Amino acid sequence: MGFRVLVLVVMATTSALPFTFFEEPGRSPFRPALRSEEAQALRHGLTLLLARRADGQPPDMRQPEMRRPEVRQLEFAELSVGQRRWDVDQCMYYCLTGVVGYSYTECQTMCT
């Protein structure tokens, strides 16, 4: 919402503020400083930027996204003794209560 308001303010500012305030004979003191083609191109670009933002497409000038560092799973040897014991117990529990029906020795072989 804030981005849209900012773009609307910029669009309104480009059409209202860029005036020269010196008087020349036969000319209005409020003649736009930008040529109409430049102002129209600027408004068109801002409108496209707003449309992309509304569609969820990333604008061309945004900063690259920050990548999260990959979280590496600890190897079994790097785990603490308590953590290893809990993992083995959990593995044994799921192995023995699972649908496949492994025996205790098969589960112990797989989990340790």
UniProtKB/Swiss-Prot annotation:
Disulfide pairings: 91-111, 95-107
KW Secreted (keyword) present: yes
Entry GO terms, CC: extracellular region
Propeptide cleavage-removed residue intervals: 23-85
Signal peptide: 1-22
Chief location bin: secreted
GO terms for MF: potassium channel regulator activity; toxin activity
Source organism, top-level taxon: Eukaryota
Record keywords: Cleavage on pair of basic residues, Disulfide bond, Ion channel impairing toxin, Neurotoxin, Potassium channel impairing toxin, Secreted, Signal, Toxin
Tissue: Expressed by the venom duct.
Record's subcellular location: Secreted
Family of this protein: Belongs to the conotoxin R superfamily.
Domain notes: The cysteine framework is XIV (C-C-C-C).
Protein name: Conotoxin vil14.4
Species per Swiss-Prot/TrEMBL record: Conus villepinii
Source species taxonomy: Eukaryota, Metazoa, Spiralia, Lophotrochozoa, Mollusca
